[in-house]
Amino acid sequence: MGGELGDARLWAGELKSLHERFVHRFSRSEPRESALAYMQGLIAPLERKNGWTLAEEAGHGGPDRIHRLLNRIDWNADEVLDDVRDYVIEHLGDPEAVLIVDDTGFLKKGVRSAGVQRQYSGTAGRTENSQIGVFLAYAGGRGRTLIDRRLYLPTSWTDDRDRCRAAGIDDTVGFETKVVMAKAMVRRAITEKIPFRWVTADAAYGFSKGWRTELERADVFHVMATTRHDTVVTRWAMDHPVHDLFPGLPRQKWKRRSCGNGAHGPRVYDWARVEVRPWHREDRRHYVIARRSVRRPDEISYYIAYCPTETTLDELIRVAGARWAVEECFQTAKQECGLDDYQVRRYDGWHRHMTLAMAVHACLTVLRARELDTGKAETDPPSSYPSPCPNFDA
């Protein structure tokens, strides 16, 4: 999506069309107009995106209207997100889609922004003063985008109600782990009948046996990364370490496959699976999957899978590899849609900004999907499938 006149007109038309879906959520003309102007500013090629630059892009005399939109005017960001999600499903809905849970960090200064503290941020790769947001991504055959979000509040916040009130956090909002937030997002997707087939997440979420059990009881198929110390039920033990299932596996059981394209080409690993929990229903299977580095065979990652009996290893590899789609969403949303360009401190303000930035990213994804449909896109296809490949993992 370049800055040419045709692209600009295309963007303007699609953003306006998406905006019209939720314009009824605002009771006054000012926030209606400001929401559209805000989204247009987030996608504009501005060096910095803040209240002043977005106001200037919108032709406002100052940032007051932007600040009122994010901090003071009464509107429900969750209701707007419902409308954005409907837009995503209408244009990108896929019964074979994968729901992906992950979190990302937003580096901040000071101590007054809701949820901020010194905590590990994957964005920085170290402990930094930051906010952490938990997100749900939707990855289908035509594209991937973000469809849900929650700001993580550490106990340093939830145990201090005066501090919470100063940041606009209601007394009813208590501490929740990131896994609990993730579970709520997936439950909402199920309740709203969003079309999907799989759920996946990294080991920070997949290690939760409670969540895996909940998904299984709802008959939700999943491939969840876990740690080598996780345990499963086998014929030999009730708590069998997953890393102990593979050392004696015959060589022919390992398959070299790509789980998708990375920055340096196909991500190729050696893969194997072992069936566990053999006394379950006939039409379902449980597997532990191992992903071994080609260049460094001592580096092995593990996954727990719950799936239909006929599911192939290649399909499970595809789902495991789909997790990287959420990282692509974060990168694109931050670089092109202003996801991390905000100066709000209040809890509602964070969710409002994220909702409008996610709307812009959804619009971007839909437009690129249309280009793919007409053969005009210059980007890679939106989904990758495992295939035999001579390239090794980096």
Regions found by a protein language model. Name each.
Residues K16, G125, G141-A167, D171, ...:
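An anionic, glycine-rich sequence signature occurring as long contiguous blocks
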Residues H24, R28-P31, R48, P195, ...:
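Intrinsically disordered or highly flexible coil/loop and linker segments, enriched in small
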Residues T332, C337-A394:
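Basic, amphipathic alpha-helical segments enriched in Lys/Arg and hydrophobic/aromatic residues
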